[in-house]
Amino acid sequence: MQTQAHPLEPFFRQAVRNSYEGKLGLRDPDVTGYVAHLLCDFSEADHLFSVRDANGHPVEELDAMILASDPVNGDASSFDAERAVRKHIGDYALFVAGMFPEATEPERRRRKQPSLADLIHAGKESYYIVSQFNLFEYEKEAPLFARLSDSFERCILGLTLIRDELGLRKSLMLPPPVN
């Protein structure tokens, strides 16, 4: 679906495929390709908070992102802008819930971090909304976002498995400590 433009894409494609297909039985090349591309995109920290407020500042809170997606009562200037922000919310929720589940722990929630349930709800809902943009230039992508919404929890689990595997590899590759 996406073109391979990022140097980490082959690595992430294989890691996602191993996790999603090999461990979870989720055999959907469009989903695995999309998630691999998402990992590449969010490997650049500035992309994690690409939604901007009216003053151009990054929007870092989930509730504020959701408000920014509203074309009637929020900051979205059009339905295309709503789709773009909702797509980002789905991506953000999937990434944070799968790769940084500790961010949803209660002590972090006191600092306005969303719970895992909040991320799942926002991610599923956002991908569903994106899937409803199913005309014209969005017609081909709409079914992918419907599948991402339907399998959101499995996609989170797949990312958590990737995270765990990467952590294991890192510990195996570290040089022995110097005394």
Say what each PLM segment does.
Residues P176-N179:
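Helix-rich, well-folded core regions that mediate interactions or catalysis
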